[in-house]
Amino acid sequence: YIGMQWTPFARWKLSAYADVFRFPWLKYGVDAPSTGKEYMLQLDYTPSRNLSVYVRYKYKQRENITPYHQQRLRMQALYTISSSVSLRTSADGICYTEANEKSRGWMIAQSVGWKPVDVPVQTDFHIAGFHTDNYRTRISSYEKNILYAFNMPSFYGKGVRLALSFRWDIVKQLSVSAKLGYTYYADRDVVGTDLEEIEGNIKADIYTLLRWKF
């Protein structure tokens, strides 16, 4: 493994790493010796205090029972409108190749964060549209969750994802957090499998947390 960071000019930063590995023995999920490599290249640009942009490319290759390679491209812009409002816009693309068969996918997302200075409340709204060929080209959705919970759900197929998170610090010791997620699938009539199977093409999820600090 080797990694580097380089700042060629003010407000520009280039990051990269290369990871080449080999597992001579069996491991979880792989019943034969395997090898692989992974590369990442990211360019960050911060033209002002209120705006930051980055472009990231990742390449992954695995040589095991069924060799494959995967390419991912992500672009994101974070813009602070004021001391209380911020925007995050992102676009993701993926290409997965296995046995000379290619599958692709993309996701475009927009988040709006609101955290007023003089009110102990903060909210975040997230909307994303996605279209991928199959499960292998699933794409993670970068959305906020309730306190102490980091949730990065992945989606595949064709649909729209909406998420709204909320936190209210009622008093210094007491706070309440909640999140409502809504996913619409345009390419299926059943969502999930086994015990999590849902009839229909809509899935909703709710998270809540009440915290009391002593």
In which residue ranges do the predicted regions lie?
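Exposed, low-structure sequence patches enriched in small/polar residues
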Residues: 1-214
